Amino acid sequence: MQMEVTLNSSRKKIREITGYTFEDEKQSTESWVTRAQSFKAAATVLSQSDISEVQYAYFYNAAISLELILKAVALFKGKGIPKTHKLQDLARTLDLPFSIEQLDTLELLSEIIIWSGRYPVPNKDSHWDNYHDVVQNKHIIRDGNITRACPKRFPTLENVSNIWDICYREVGGKSA
């Protein structure tokens, strides 16, 4: 047992020497951006799939990529890592140049992170009602019997990428 404790202590010392500690990674904008890029790449692949069953996986990966890149911006601006999944609120605190439509997209993606991307129903029926009566209605257009997505608000890959690029430029990256 003593040898195992010593070995773990040695591993921790190596991480400290190489700068790969919990605190270093937590405060590394680059780490947050890299993880955001990974989820964005997954969302891109899923968006190109012909398999309709992957839609929630696409939305979830797109939403998580935006949450991570927004938190990278917060860290870059010296605001720490906010403990929230409310992307619209996070974006507003960062003073990023988002349009009303983009903020609405972030609102929908927040619901996807919190529940609809992972579960068929939320923990509270009030979340269900808010999603279907308020949030989702901003993203659809009804014309008689026809319902379609609002092109400027729906989280298509193009809309998600435009939001992502605003954040990425904020941390010193160049648009993809």
State where each predicted segment sits:
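Hydrophobic alpha-helical segments of membrane proteins, primarily the transmembrane helices
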Residues: 28, 32, 58-61
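Helix-loop segments that flank and shape redox-cofactor active sites
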Residues: 41-56
